[in-house]
């Protein structure tokens, strides 16, 4: 089940979609909605108007939204984490897992910390679906399982 989470200190993004189960290596039975969210971000990220780093395109473009962890999804997660580590340094986890955010700040680590992968991926989602965000359920590529989870997460927060 995808969760609605308030974003603190993330300029331009008032909230984000959080996963409720870890997605990636070692989690073959992650919640289908959570896997679909991560896969959907990879799919729309390759076709969004915001320029995705070219190093990510070959791996991300192989992902399809199946709602199940598969080799293409795991490879895309690994590529994303390697990209973030190269860009932001050794404080970025490269464990092959999109973790559940369990902090109010959306950050982990000492000091100012580092944003969780899912928070950073939500920026990709925001830019790639800017004309409809946060109603990503209205995107034709959004599978029914994710669309239902998004509507449930947003109910009570937004007008239809």
Feature-to-residue mapping (PLM):
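Cell-envelope/ECM-targeting effectors and their regulatory/trafficking segments
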Residues: 1-160
């Amino acid at each position: 089940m995808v969760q609605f989470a308030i974003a603190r200190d993330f300029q331009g993004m008032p909230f984000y979609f959080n996963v409720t189960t870890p997605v990636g290596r070692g989690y073959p039975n992650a919640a289908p909605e959570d896997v679909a969210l991560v896969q959907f971000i990879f799919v729309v990220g390759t076709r969004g108007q915001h320029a995705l780093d070219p190093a990510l395109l070959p791996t991300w473009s192989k992902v399809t939204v199946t709602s199940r962890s598969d080799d293409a999804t795991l490879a895309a997660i690994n590529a994303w984490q390697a990209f973030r580590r190269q860009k932001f340094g050794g404080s970025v986890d490269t464990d092959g897992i999109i973790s559940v955010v369990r902090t109010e700040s959306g950050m982990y680590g000492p000091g100012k910390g580092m944003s969780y992968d899912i928070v950073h991926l939500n920026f990709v989602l925001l830019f790639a679906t800017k004309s409809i965000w946060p109603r990503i359920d209205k995107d034709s590529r959004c599978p029914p399982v994710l669309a239902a989870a998004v509507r449930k997460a947003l109910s009570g927060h937004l007008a239809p």
